Amino acid sequence: VSDLPSPAAGPIPAAFPLAADRPVPAPGVTVRPATVHDLPRVAEIAAPFVRDTCVTFEEEVWDVPAWHRKLDDVAARGLPFLVAEVEGPAEPGSPRGTVVAGYAYASAWRPKPAYRHTAEGTIYLDPAHAGRGVGTALLAALLEALAAAGVRQVVSVVADVPEAAGSLPLHRRFGFVEAGRLTAVGFKHGRWVDTILLQRSL
């Protein structure tokens, strides 16, 4: 994609260097590509957000085969699917003494082909490991991987609910800005929910 024109000047700031001038992930957090062995833990992290909150607009909890299909789809598009490990009880297939504390992946922003250089980022963390720098490590690695894949714009769609409040400052620390708001586009658990569109150039 090196011959692509630069994005037009506008409200989205130019990206700061991905390897410098960014939040530094906390020690003790390891980010790596997800494997099929991680999917039971990914499903475990995701389920309460689907079942109990409006953070995600999914209404059906995905089982492991559904997550396997998602992993395959992300890989087929050349996009990253990452997990973050921290010290904790050992899991099958994980190094001794580590536990997957969060995951992040990228999806196509829209199906039409001209959107191919824009991706949507998704990050979920186990609340039991909040405050350990897991989100910082995942978002840093996700942006690095997307830049390497030739993505030019990253969008994150954040539900405007208290449970997602931590997502806004995390993304803003990495240079995301609010690009818009969609009013009452989701209905879940008996209420209408707005979404906030965050965007960052790579």
Give the positions of each predicted feature.
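Short acidic N-proximal helix/loop "leader" segments that mark the beginning
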Residues: V1-A26
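Acetyl-CoA-dependent GNAT
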Residues: A15-P17, P33-V36, E59-A128, L139-A140, ...
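A short beta-loop-alpha structural element at the N-terminal edge
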Residues: T30-V42
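Helix-loop element at the rim of GNAT/NAT acetyltransferase active sites that forms part
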Residues: E44-V61, D73-V74
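Conserved catalytic-core motifs of GNAT/GCN5-like acyltransferases
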Residues: Y105, V157-A159, R172-V193
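Active-site acidic-Proline motif in GNAT/NAT acetyltransferases
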Residues: I123-A128, R132, D160-P162
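Conserved acetyl-CoA-binding loop-helix of GNAT-fold acetyltransferases
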Residues: G131-A147, A165, P169-R173
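Conserved GNAT acetyl-CoA-binding A-motif
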Residues: L146-A159
